[in-house]
């Protein structure tokens, strides 16, 4: 149960739904700063909730959106994958698979910092998520390599 100042899981799901609408309306591949900040805020508030405490609002719809998001990523349409993952999160706000796809779409669209946050959130929900762990380790190794090369120059 959340404190009175904290949004409920239903309110967080509504945020994901509205963000999905906003992303669907835009033509640009680069994420809108408003969407990025709203997503950061939603992640913060979700981490104050207990994953699995409340059931998904519509697990079947979330599963369908997860599949649609993966197909969009496979086709190279990051914006569509991002929007579909957000729509899926409006049905299941603690779904690690949807967060993983959201993080992948963030990375593919150039929002590396947000991708790192979302992948970390995926691991917060499910520490055994293999894809998120592997991607996070690869990103960390790449970023560590970049820092070493910049220092050498």
Positions of the model-derived regions?
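Register position in tetratricopeptide repeats
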Residues: 74, 108, 141-145
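TPR-adjacent "capping" and linker segments in tetratricopeptide-repeat scaffold/adaptor proteins
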Residues: 3, 47-64, 87-90
């Amino acid at each position: 149960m959340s404190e009175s100042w904290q949004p409920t899981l239903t309110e967080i799901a509504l945020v994901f739904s509205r963000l999905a609408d906003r992303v669907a309306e835009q033509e640009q591949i680069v994420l809108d700063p408003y969407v990025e900040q709203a997503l950061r805020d939603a992640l913060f508030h979700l981490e104050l909730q207990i994953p699995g405490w409340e059931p998904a609002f519509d697990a079947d719809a979330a599963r369908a959106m997860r599949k649609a998001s993966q197909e969009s990523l496979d086709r190279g349409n990051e914006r569509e994958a991002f929007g579909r993952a957000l729509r899926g999160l409006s049905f299941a706000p603690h779904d690690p698979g949807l967060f993983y796809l959201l993080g992948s779409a963030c990375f593919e669209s150039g929002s590396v910092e947000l991708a790192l946050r979302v992948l970390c959130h995926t691991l917060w929900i499910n520490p055994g998520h293999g894809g998120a762990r592997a991607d996070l380790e690869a990103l960390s190794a790449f970023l560590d390599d970049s820092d070493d090369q910049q220092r050498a120059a």
